[in-house]
Amino acid sequence: MNNRVHQGHLARKRFGQNFLNDQFVIDSIVSAINPQKGQAMVEIGPGLAALTEPVGERLDKLTVIELDRDLAARLQTHPFLGPKLTIYQQDAMTFNFGELAEKMGQPLRVFGNLPYNISTPLMFHLFSYTDAIADMHFMLQKEVVNRLVAGPNSKAYGRLSVMAQYYCNVIPVLEVPPSAFTPPPKVDSAVVRLVPHATMPHPVKDVRVLSRITTEAFNQRRKTIRNSLGNLFSVEVLTGMGIDPAMRAENISVAQYCQMANYLAENAPLQES
């Protein structure tokens, strides 16, 4: 039997499809999301409706974004969900979540079992819409969740950690084994909750500068920041900010990266492109 076929649908490798089928895990995720009527609930990648059905049962309306046209068509004709759904058959990576929040008249509650092959770039796309998002619950590769929640001085801590924690409070919810999916992925999975900060704990003047600094630092994470960021900061400037130039990218806190970004935004602002 082909383990890539589930409920008559052949999982497409190019879409990174692995379908959730463990009822205990499904119930645990829905409880964590806790959907309520009247909320602007949005699911990315509903697939074969493992989460869509139990979430949809609690709601009058549900918006879904599904790239796979066959799966989008199945949802349109779903016996009880169909009338409740607004289906966008398009790529979540190019979706304008700000426009949708404006249309729905409230911040969005976004959730989904995300295709692992696009999860990191999709996170960065969603971070640009945190003003329009109330919270997010995602099933991701466990390694990605570890990176999202990691603190300084750990191997998992990287650019994704800094940018996620700049925008959101990041909370791990539960771990999920490969056996909970068809076909089983080759990696462990985990569910994470991301809640955009109501008030930024470390506001930056230009988030593009923060993005640039973290990219340059973590692209050369084995180097000291005296070397990896030497083109942006002198030793004197780093020392003046209370940051040891002998530290590496993984030793610097989110607050310190934001401090560095604000210094650069004031003293060497990026030109508008």
Swiss-Prot record:
The keyword Cytoplasm applies. The keyword ATP-binding does not apply. One of its GO terms (cellular component) is cytosol. It comes from the Bacteria. It holds the Pfam family RrnaAD. SMART domains: rADc. Its EC number is 2.1.1.182. Keywords: Cytoplasm, Methyltransferase, RNA-binding, rRNA processing, S-adenosyl-L-methionine, Transferase. It is an enzyme of class 2 (transferase). GO terms for molecular function: 16S rRNA (adenine(1518)-N(6)/adenine(1519)-N(6))-dimethyltransferase activity; RNA binding. S-adenosyl-L-methionine binds at residues 18, 20, 45, 66, 91, 113. It catalyses: adenosine(1518)/adenosine(1519) in 16S rRNA + 4 S-adenosyl-L-methionine = N(6)-dimethyladenosine(1518)/N(6)-dimethyladenosine(1519) in 16S rRNA + 4 S-adenosyl-L-homocysteine + 4 H(+). It is found in: Cytoplasm. Disulfide bonds: none annotated. Belongs to the class I-like SAM-binding methyltransferase superfamily. rRNA adenine N(6)-methyltransferase family. RsmA subfamily. Specifically dimethylates two adjacent adenosines (A1518 and A1519) in the loop of a conserved hairpin near the 3'-end of 16S rRNA in the 30S particle. May play a critical role in biogenesis of 30S subunits. PANTHER family: DIMETHYLADENOSINE TRANSFERASE, DIMETHYLADENOSINE TRANSFERASE-RELATED. This is Ribosomal RNA small subunit methyltransferase A. It comes from Escherichia coli O139:H28 (strain E24377A / ETEC). The gene is rsmA.
